[in-house]
Amino acid sequence: MKFRVPRLIIRTASSTSSSSTAPSTSRVSFKDIQNNKHGLSFELDVTMREGHHDMKTFGLGFLRSVSNREHQAHTLASLHAPYAAMEFCLHEIVHKNTNTKLRKFWNKISKDVEKSNALKEDVRMLGGNELPLPAADRYVAAIHRAALNRCSENYPSSEGDLLLAHMYVRYLADLFGGSMLGKPTELALGLEANSLKFYTPNNGPHELMIKYHKLQFIEMFYDELNKCGHEMTAERRQLVVQEAILAFKLNADIFTEREGFLSGALLGGCKLVSGYLKSLMSLRY
């Protein structure tokens, strides 16, 4: 039997997820950003405009993840794997001190954006395990390949360039998705406010900027991307773009690999509506 998720639920989830994964949370804010109008940032944003990030799949995947605590735990566990791999590789780049631009970029934002520990704690809080799906294993393998990629053996300073693609896909998603998906998730699952650390800002040096002047942090993120891309050839930048396209696909696979994708999304949509109604009733009375 095939399940069809009502269009209203799909539109609601897609609009929420588009805010969470694309830099353009609104037309006005997108126009206000300047550093994504040129350089590597512009080239990476093209992947969004060309539809390589499947908003419908992400929206349905989000709904499925809030259908019950077990599914949420599985989703967060599978996300923990690529986050942990990426952040480990980035710290290794800093330790090696070969890719100077990337090292400076990561040192500047790491305490604000790292999420692997938060994901690990959330999975434990939900009573899940940390065993990722095969899709997450493929994602991790891609990250490790990206971390070791160089222009050639004679250019160790280019090692890790392709990690910029994974930072773009994951961290811009968190910056916009954290505050917008946290509350719906908690309402659908009946969790206390701010109980999921993945969706709350880190206690980093730019915490207040992220909370109250998020666009400034996004501008800084784009600026650092452009600085890293400035010394690359056009061919090298294109490899970063292709890696971002791959990362979008690998991310979608995490949501679609398990059985019951559409039926779970339908149940999650009902849980989300129910959670909102309960919240409204509690405020009213």
Model-found features: residue ranges?
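Metal- and O2-centered redox machinery and metal/ROS homeostasis
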Residues: 2-285
